[in-house]
């Protein structure tokens, strides 16, 4: 585990490099993951084992970039996860013909707890992931965000991501227990 940034507000952005690093922060990550995705516009319900699986799977993928924004108290207030798009088969299928999957890094997860938003933390997690991507292997970054073009969309656009015009329907369990689909929009950036 390596500290990439120590912010003035007491938050450190750390890079998890091994499954053992993930074990140290597992419980804190699970709590943050469940809380963040339970909020609009996603309103998704994840059980603890599902959230834990996100972290474990990411750390097993070669060339992953797994970042947590943490406090000394052990609280995880945000996260950013990236890995080769080839590790996410459904996404790789959607973008074939748009970007070369073997040269594309997928920014799979970005989340910041509600009380820690509007402090530049989301942008900083994106910037740190961009800095960690191996540009010898990957020429493009791809992500998907809510098609509602909310604050997250605007943040990515200001950072230079381009709207691809490609959408994907994502099915998920909602907070009310139902399963529904919503539309996600792909954004990309050349490195």
Regions inferred by a protein language model and the residue ranges of each:
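Conserved beta-strand-loop-alpha-helix junction that forms the acyl-donor binding cleft
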Residues: 117, 129, 142-153, 169-174
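Conserved acyl-donor/pantetheine-binding loop and adjacent beta-alpha core of acyl/acetyltransferases
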Residues: 81-109, 168-178
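Active-site rim helix/loop that mediates acceptor-substrate recognition in acyltransferases
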Residues: 42-71, 76, 81, 87
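Conserved GNAT-family N-acetyltransferase fold
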Residues: 67, 78-80, 105, 110, ...
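Conserved acetyl-CoA-binding loop-helix of GNAT-fold acetyltransferases
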Residues: 112, 118-133, 154-158
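Short hydrophobic/aromatic beta-strand or adjacent loop that forms the aromatic wall/cage
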Residues: 64, 181-187
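Conserved N-terminal entry element of GNAT/NAT acetyltransferase domains
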Residues: 1-27, 31, 35
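Conserved acetyl-CoA-binding loop of GNAT-fold acetyltransferases
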Residues: 157-166
